[in-house]
């Protein structure tokens, strides 16, 4: 009985950390479809495979970092960098410190702005009040440490995944013919593979800065090898959800007005099925995406 309980706890931690990766990756740009369109769909039919390449690239990097952190018991990014870079730590640890400060300024700012604006649109409350609500929620979750962050990440991930599937699957099914036509058009246009791979590389590399917030979760692993399992699961989750978003955006990618859209997902919903119900749901997902990234 005790072994069974320990096994369940072990796998819940592995899954929880995988969800931390997903919620960190899933921000307002992901929810709105803007990032997926800019980095993938714009580069033609290669968008069906390049998200997987980017996430595998991330998974290898994150798995090694978490494995290293657990093996050497370094659970804050400064100690981790010092151990990783060795005699080069005085240079690279300090460079990473500057990078991390920049990221920590930008990520919450984007969360406050995106979440506050969307919440204001949904509720009609003043923007500043909505921004304050978002900020208080993020602050409360953050001050209670990594255990609460991991639990919140798991709950948010389930809500986000279910929400994305509700939004995208009906539109993908209803517009499967448009997806086929778009893929054929993309294929005939012969977009260069090199540019598509480079864009995916840029997207994946930008995500690597998240390692600073990941290493603290390595403490919860029973063994260093659990990091590999966790990031493997996270990789599969991210690939599936990114592919779903790609297919959804492909339903409207051939529309001449698509290039003007700042929120491709909203344009997809308004052009597809169930817009009355799905439009507010997309707004909620954008808020959850902004909050999950900041947390």
Where are these regions (language model features)?
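Extracellular/periplasmic helix-exit of transmembrane alpha-helices
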Residues: 62-67, 174-180, 199-202, 218, ...
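Juxtamembrane transmembrane-helix boundary signature
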Residues: 21, 52-78, 248-255
